[in-house]
Amino acid sequence: EFRRVLFRSECAVLARQLAERIANELQVPCYCYEAAAKTPERKNLAICRKGEYEALPQRMSEATEAPDYGAREWDEQLAQTGCTAVGARDFLIATNFNLNTTSTRRANAIAFDVREKGRPMREGGSPVGKPMKDEKGEIIMQPGTLKATKAIGWFIDEYGIAQVSMNITDINITPLHVAFDEVCRCAQNRGIRVTGTEIVGLIPKRTLLEAGTYFLKKQQRSTGIP
């Protein structure tokens, strides 16, 4: 059986073709994101999802906000189906970091420390100060320490603890083991410890091998350990 590797650019073409078919055959408008994005801004899925379902009636009527395929005026069918997004990207790793606290606020603080988007800059450097804005009226963000990551803090009833929940959108920029160490460091700076982790879904084998090699070296042990 003949097999070959598909390049991301080829996947992007296929993603756009699929998005067009979904729009034409199912009448569900589609945004294209990541490698399939038609504009630089839409590489970020969060931009495509901006405002979520409630914002769709307005977005459908604006040329700069409308879906890439199947854009039309808001109607009863759209009210039922909404829109969808199709993209081409590398593996996304979804991981959760368990914390020895029940405080969602502290978990969020750690998430804001590390996620690429960071947190709003506030007047006087106070956590309760008013968000600072630029000349365009947009909130000024203080970037976090980990590129290509998104994160939030929440409380898990099942475990009775708070977590930092993270998506790593580019493992070539921020490998899993780097994210783990950085979350541990930022948690420790706030008097909190990471007590465990969860991986949600599939991850590449090389991610685990890289993590194993990294921590063996950190322990000053041979990387040849089976």
Describe every region a protein language model picked out.
Residues 2-6:
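Short, small-residue-biased leader/transition segments that mark boundaries at the very start
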Residues 7-226:
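Long, contiguous binding/interaction regions
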